[in-house]
Amino acid sequence: MVYDSLDVPDTLDFHGMDIEVARRHVQIQIALYLIGKQFGYETWIAQNDKGIKYQGKALLEHEGILKSISEKPLIGPYSGASNAGRFIDCIWFAGDLDIPAVMEVEHTTGVTSGLDRMKNFRDHIPPIGSRYVIVAPDEDRDHVLAEGRKPMFKDMDVRFFPYSSVEELYILCQRRHLKGITKEFLDCYMEQVN
């Protein structure tokens, strides 16, 4: 899989993450944005990742990237929702009243913190039936499933979206220019945890 012109500025804080792991994180985040764009979704990218440059311009300047999460009707009116969503890696919005997926790109050590961030976000928005997705390397599957099955996350629709499935879906989108995709189609690429 080829990622066009990706620039990860030295000023971004990846919390001690190895540069290759950080680069992979950003590559997957961009693939998620491009998949969402293909499906007609607007995408929120974590506030701390907005300085990443892709194809010569900041992510924030790309079509379909939300500049402010609080501008969405499902977020703005609800106390604490904007703050709770600010650092979530990727949120897809289908119009103003649907969130097909809330996603955290994680590696083994960050799975629980990603689930915690998504749970906090979910607790600040109205009940909408979204998917709460951990996007992680394929080899982290067992760890993601174990963490997602903990009692504190039981009432969430937690899913595992392995990197290989992200890349497969990205390539399919690029080759076939998919349209009219349903959430059920997305479910084919994500494993339900509970």
Describe the predicted segments one by one.
Residues 138-194:
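Domain-level recognition of nuclease-like catalytic cores that cleave nucleotide substrates
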Residues 1-53, 80:
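Nuclease catalytic cores
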Residues 26-41, 93-111:
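Short, solvent-exposed linear motifs at loop/edge-of-secondary-structure regions
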Residues 21, 45-97, 179:
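Active-site metal-binding core of divalent-cation-utilizing nuclease and nuclease-like domains
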Residues 73, 77, 81-88, 98-162:
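Catalytic cores of nucleic-acid endonucleases
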